[in-house]
Amino acid sequence: DQIQWAEKEYNNSKFNLPSPFNKVISQLPEWVSKPYEEIAENFLKDLGIFDTHVALITAFGLSVLDKNESVDRCRTLPSHYTLTHYLSGKDPDVFYHPAKDLLSIVNPDLDEWASAKSLYINEGDVIIHPSYLEYSTPQVERRRVTITLLFNIERIPA
């Protein structure tokens, strides 16, 4: 399954990459990528654009964070969307409000716009978010393994 594949990739490359482990995968077995293709198709259906658009996967990555490791604020541009599959570990990412600073200038006392939020996640959860959204991963309490897929939505030529 995907967890065994991820552990094998990690064990084969962990001494060749800096910590925290983040590897771009160029050759992916079809059985690993197929579920993500289906999720991307369902995302297009949810948006109501499945008949006119296609999701083009532009990058695929594997991240392994060991206890007390973290990831600084980042975003995954220039892709349109980022899909994260939490294979193991329950430590969530923190997502930052893209216009918080601007809103604070206009109305500094407005508390309803939090600058950052995290989602409650379980192992196996998949989330999709716009790639312009900054996120980080605070120190994890135990090993966390995620697969990240970047994709663009393109109109199907008529």
Describe these PLM feature segments.
Residues 48-60, 95:
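A short coil-to-beta-strand element that immediately follows conserved catalytic motifs
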Residues 61-128, 138, 156:
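Catalytic core of non-heme Fe(II) oxygenases with the double-stranded beta-helix
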Residues 1-53, 68-70:
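Non-heme Fe(II)/2-oxoglutarate
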Residues 135, 139-141:
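Asparagine-centered strand-capping/turn motif at beta-strand->loop junctions
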